[in-house]
Amino acid sequence: MGTVPATRCVRGFSRAVRRRSPFTAILVFAVLLFQLACKSLTPIDTKPLDNAGIGYSAIKELKAQHITATEVSEIAKVRQAGLSDEDCVTLLQIFHGRGETFTAGDAIASLHQSGMSEGTVLALAGMDQVGLGYGELQAMHLAGLSEAIVLEVARHHAAGTPALSGASLGTLRNLRMDNGTLLELVRRGIPDSEAAEIIAARRHGSTDAEILRHFSGS
């Protein structure tokens, strides 16, 4: 008989815990929501933007685009590399327009510091060509290939269509082929599989005009 009250007590405690469980879950959920709300209301520290030389109106525009703490440091890199306030705002618009976080600060800074113009850098960003493959485009520019060629190669990459590689174009440039001829070969969509033949023809004395006549593309 002495064990019955103890059993009833345990059962009563279990029922009490079960009754409190929904309330406990709701309380925990409410606390989490409160923490998230506080975090979202915490103002972004834009001091790095100010230190990078970005003006008040541009910072205001960046805030209006809901710039994140991570993006603040990336945009600061771009501004420190010499791009304008307007360029910084445009870059954030481009990435957010694709539903992406702006993480290309190093790539864009490197491209611009290599001598590439603001317009070309922005165009590459618009084509989503400032990711892992940007190094080839930068190397092409440093090899003396025109920005028009760099952009045309980037367009083919973005479209997934054939184009001569940066290495092949650099070799042809070293063989004194004109930038205009190289641009036309890229426009024609000459695949890199034909590069060896073009290089051999050039080394055997073929002129720019002869090469353009022979390699008509698709």
Specify the residue positions occupied by each region the protein language model found.
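Bacterial N-terminal signal peptides
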Residues: T24-Q35
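N-terminal secretory signal peptides that target proteins for export/translocation
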Residues: M1-R19
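General marker for long, soluble alpha-helical cores
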Residues: A37-S218
